Regions:
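Metal-ion/cofactor- or nucleotide/acyl-coenzyme-handling active-site neighborhoods
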Residues: 1-247
Length: 247
């Protein structure tokens, strides 16, 4: 099988790897009625969107964000699927060669969510993604690791390229938004705001938990956001721009 981005490189799907893959779609109960896709934008701070997010039938999150403590009133607790960037596993948990307990304690907040990994995007992602899978199995964790199919991500990139989104790679948030539109009847996005000021012109951090900016040139964020705005304008999805109304 060819990798998504390293497309000249291939991986042999051995019996051991095949056993790691689900027999049928783990999301076979779709379409879900109301879905929340929660980005990590600083606009979520003091938004009071937590209760609204948690009332959704299915909640998508990106890159293992914090959801516990005071922040939960803004971002919610519920998580059904969360993407995992293997670089986080490498940097924060030393590729799970150690720090397995710390990793398992941190992901406990996600309950029985799916951890979605890009194991077949770059060859360098494979071993770390598999390590997450095996760690969850070894410790009988309630979460389950699943992998993006490289052909799906290639098709997705190809589709958005025809709409003008030409990037080295689509961002996790944009991939998950695209998947949610296929899996859900109604999609609402929270925390998608790639600007340094809010609508009220107040300065905000890049993420709700830090101000670390993305690598320049890797994703086409402005073009992605333009597409999201167009989808919002057409009523295909809803975009939450500011505070949520509390009951």
């Amino acid at each position: 099988m060819s990798y998504e981005v390293d497309s000249k490189k291939t991986i042999l799907i051995t019996e051991d790897i095949f056993k790691m893959l689900p027999v049928s779609s783990p999301l076979s109960v779709y379409p879900f009625k109301n879905c929340a896709v929660v980005g990590n934008g600083g606009i979520l701070k003091n938004s009071s969107c937590g209760a609204e997010i948690d009332s959704s039938d299915f909640v998508f999150r990106c890159n293992l964000p914090p959801t516990t403590g005071n922040i939960s009133k803004d971002v919610g607790n519920k998580t059904n699927l969360v993407t995992v960037n293997p670089s986080i596993i490498a940097q924060k948990y030393n590729k799970l060669n150690e720090k397995k307990t710390e990793f398992l304690e941190n992901i406990a907040a996600y309950g029985d969510a799916f951890l979605l990994l890009p194991a077949f995007s770059f060859r360098s992602n494979t071993a770390t993604s598999f390590k997450v899978y095996h760690t969850l199995k070894e410790f009988k964790a309630t979460q389950r690791a699943i992998f993006f199919h490289p052909s799906y991500l290639k098709s997705l990139a190809q589709f958005w390229r025809t709409k003008g989104v030409k990037a080295y790679r689509l961002s996790s948030g944009f991939m998950i938004t695209s998947a949610a539109l296929e899996l859900c009847e109604n999609v609402k996005l929270y925390g998608f705001w790639p600007f340094s000021k809010s609508i009220e012109k107040m300065p905000i951090s890049h993420h709700y938990y830090d101000n670390q900016l993305p690598k320049p040139g890797f994703h086409a964020m402005p073009k992605e956001y333009n597409q999201i705005l167009q989808l919002h304008g057409k009523g295909i999805l809803k975009l939450q721009f500011g505070k949520c109304e509390s009951d």
